[in-house]
Structure formats: C-alpha cells, structure tokens
C-alpha cells in the first residue's frame, strides 16, 4: 500500500486547493489494478472523492513486435528517437494509434510518419504562401468549432479518427489549389481549419511568413519560369530555399 499512498500524497500536496482532485490521471494499462484502484480507495477515504475525473490507460510500446522492456534490452529513449527522426514525425506516429492500443515502433511505421509529416507541411506551406501572395491575411488560431474533428477527440481521445478529418481537409485544400479559378474564401477556410486541427494536435505545420524580400523573389522566380530562363529561376529558387520557403 505504500506505493499507492505515495502517489496520493504527491497529488494531494500539489492539488490541495482542489481537494486533491485532478482532471486527468494517466498511466499504463497494467497499473489499472491494483495500483490505480488502491489510489482511488485511499483518496476517497482521505478527501471523499475518487481522485480523478478521467482515467487514461495507455497501451505498451512494442519494438519490432516485441514489448519494449529493460529485461529484453530493447529500450529506446524518446530523446534518441527525436534526434534521429524528428519530434513531429514521432508525434504523428503516436497520434495515429489510439492511446489504449499497443504502439508498434518499427522503421516502417516511423518512416510512414515522416512521409505523412512531409505531406502536411507541403500542403500547409503552399496554402500560407498562396494566401499571402494574394494579399489575404492569414487567420489566427481561434480554437476550431468544426464538429467532426472535436467529436472524435471527445470520443475517448480518438486521435486516429481526428487525423482522418485533418487529412480529408488537406485533400480538399490540395484540390482547391489545383483549380484554374481559385476560390480564395474556400482556400482561406481550408487553411484556418487545418491550422486549428494542427494546433489542437500539437503539430507544427511549418507555416511560412513571407517578408517583402521573399514576395519580390517569388515574383522574379515566376517571371523567370514564364520566360523559360531556367538558369535564373534555379538561382532564385535557391534563394527561396535558403529563406525556408521551399
């Protein structure tokens, strides 16, 4: 019982003003019993409440289809994964699996997540550039009220389904950008929703803010392409790459 008491005491000492009551308590699904049941019992005896409003029990991480554990010697540190693959692809890989399900970490799954992140940033960068070049102010993050996306998050934090809503919006945005006559209001709507979804998921979409120099470089770059001056367009493209636009 000492282990369970330690957790209750720590929570009570930090959240005493809330009567030792927290909104979300997380942990691996193997802690559901007896640890979390004992925490609840002790907290209820002490404060008269069940300690937490929501309990989230996550699945284990499997490395190449084996449970990650010290005994198997296959432990991978998060800092090493982020250093090698990047934080955003790793986040997307995690979000693409429901938190209660086992998470399979393989070169294939992280590789797919890297490709997915590239698709997201490619679309989001293109959207932000097109809108700015049209003289349209980029909408600020406001907390989306798009029902379908947040319904999925409210449904036991169903991040895989929430990602599906995001990808549907990205598909619509790419289709709108390919139109000969672009509906700029529709495109602005695509941008705003994608930006809200990414913000809610904690994903950096790689938004580009164009300064006056970048706007002028873009104009010269497109003029050079139209004139089929490929040598000049390559030089200008290189400058845009240096500014993080391409």
Each model region followed by its residue ranges:
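Alpha-helical recognition segments enriched in aromatics with Gly/Pro capping
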Residues: 1-127
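Structural preference for alpha-helix termini/caps and helix-kink/transition segments
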Residues: 67-69, 74-246
């Amino acid at each position: 019982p000492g282990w369970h008491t330690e957790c209750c005491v720590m929570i009570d000492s930090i959240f005493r003003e809330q009567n030792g009551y927290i909104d979300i308590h997380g942990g691996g699904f193997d802690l559901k019993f007896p640890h979390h049941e004992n925490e609840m019992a002790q907290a209820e005896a002490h404060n008269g409440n069940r300690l937490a409003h929501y309990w989230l029990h996550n699945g284990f991480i499997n490395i190449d289809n084996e449970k990650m554990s010290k005994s198997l010697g296959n432990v991978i540190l998060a800092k090493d994964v982020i250093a090698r693959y990047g934080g955003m692809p790793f986040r997307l890989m995690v979000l693409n699996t429901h938190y209660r399900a086992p998470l399979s970490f393989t070169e294939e799954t992280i590789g797919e997540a890297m490709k997915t992140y590239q698709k997201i940033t490619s679309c989001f960068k293109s959207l932000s550039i097109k809108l700015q070049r049209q003289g349209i102010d980029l909408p600020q993050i406001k907390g989306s009220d798009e029902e379908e996306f947040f319904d999925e998050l409210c449904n036991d934090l169903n991040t895989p389904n929430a990602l599906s809503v995001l990808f549907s919006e990205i598909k619509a945005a790419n289709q709108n950008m390919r139109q000969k006559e672009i509906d700029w209001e529709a495109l602005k709507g695509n941008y705003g929703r994608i930006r809200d979804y990414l913000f809610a998921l904690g994903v950096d979409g790689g938004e580009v803010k164009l300064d006056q120099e970048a706007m002028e470089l873009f104009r010269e770059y497109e003029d050079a392409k139209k004139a089929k001056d490929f040598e000049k367009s390559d030089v200008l493209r290189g400058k845009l790459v240096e500014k993080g636009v391409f």
